[in-house]
Regions:
Chain A
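Helix-to-beta-strand junctions that scaffold the AdoMet/dcAdoMet cofactor pocket
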Residues: 32
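A beta-strand edge to alpha-helix "cap/lid" segment located at domain peripheries
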Residues: 2-29, 37-134
Length: 134, 134
């Protein structure tokens, strides 16, 4: 039987599949419609509200037949009716790292928040560079 | 009577107060101890697990009597037993933007996840720079 964590990771896969295929309709269906939603795209400001969040996706996906994105090493964190998936993203040559927050709707998970920002390089940084800004 | 959202913003304030005063004991008390916890510090990799998350804070706060951080414009998003606070951070001269996920423990909120990454400059970018990486 498929478990909560598997379903959560499946929803996360579906989010990146919609992204990669620039499928705005699938993206709409994946975002929660009965919970507050928000997004922080890389280097961009906070976007709050379903209409505003979907408009941000339309702007990103508007003239693409597809999007060169893949995600790696997803980690699922279950917090009851909410679930978080943390993963790495590669968008073209950019390496990013993301927090995706999902809410459970019966047996499905729908996304309520996404933040993505720069990831460290795969190579180990030097000792004096290991300490992050915070 | 104080509401859920006010309590959630209060917990977010407490998180930044612990950070600013480099109070590792307060930080320990603020992080959830019965839920999975994780953190993504700016430009750093995913850290999972309470011991690992607290060790990351100890490394950041270890030789500081205080930390030059302030947060601004917090926005609370209630998802039932989970709450998200989105806010801007200023750390020294760095401008960051954060997702803080909290879990409700009776009447309190404890932090379960934090991601912080670069914020856009306050000035409006030029037209061709407005589109984020994604």
């Amino acid at each position: 039987m498929i478990g909560d964590e598997e379903r959560l990771l499946f929803a996360n896969d579906a989010f990146y599949a919609a992204f990669a295929s620039a499928d705005i309709r699938a993206m709409q269906d994946l975002w929660a419609d009965k919970h507050p939603v928000s997004v922080i795209h890389p280097g961009a400001d906070i976007v709050v509200g379903r209409a505003e969040v979907l408009a941000s996706w339309k702007a990103i996906l508007r003239d693409d037949t597809g999007f060169d994105i893949e995600h790696r090493n997803p980690v699922a964190r279950l917090l009851g009716e909410t679930g978080i998936v943390l993963c790495r993203e590669r968008v073209g040559t950019h390496h990013l790292i993301a927090t995706n927050v999902f809410v459970r709707i019966v047996d499905n998970w729908r996304i309520a928040h996404h933040q993505s920002g720069p990831a460290p390089l795969q190579a180990k940084p030097k000792q004096e560079e290991q300490r992050p800004v915070h």
